[in-house]
Each structure stands twice: as C-alpha cells, then as structure tokens.
Amino acid sequence: MIRLRYFASLRERLGVADEWIPLPDAVSDVEGLKHWLQDRTGPWREALSDQRLQVAVNQELVKADTPVRDGDEVAWFPPVTGG
C-alpha cells in the first residue's frame, strides 16, 4: 500500500485529502503514478495535468522519474506562491 496526500487547491478539486491504495503493478515511478491517477474518473485528469504541481515522496521533493515503492507516502501540491 502507498499513502497518497493532496494539499491546498488540489485537495479541494479532488475532494479528498489522503488515501491508501495498493501500489499498481504497472507503476514504478512518480510519472507512472500520475498517469495511473489521471485515468480515474472525475476530476483527476485535469487536476493532475498542471505541469507546475510539486510532488514529494516520503516528505522529500522529487522529480517525475523517482521510484515509488510499497509503503511510500506520495504528496501532491500546487506550487507555493507568496506576496
């Protein structure tokens, strides 16, 4: 199982803050997980298509080719802006 967490406006768009899912067999990295999530029905494709999204695995910012393993926590959040 992996824990998925969604923050800020992304959480609002998806209507979920976090969830536990079995790691899909076809998923080996962050990019693959993103594509798998985008195949869900509802707002997933559009919400995760923003190229500015940040992703962290086990609380460390990572790139799309970072491996995802059983037991990981993967967090998605929009870019942080300030004024």
Regions found by a protein language model. Give the residues of each.
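Ubiquitin-like/PB1-type beta-grasp interaction modules and other compact soluble beta-rich domains
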Residues: 1-82
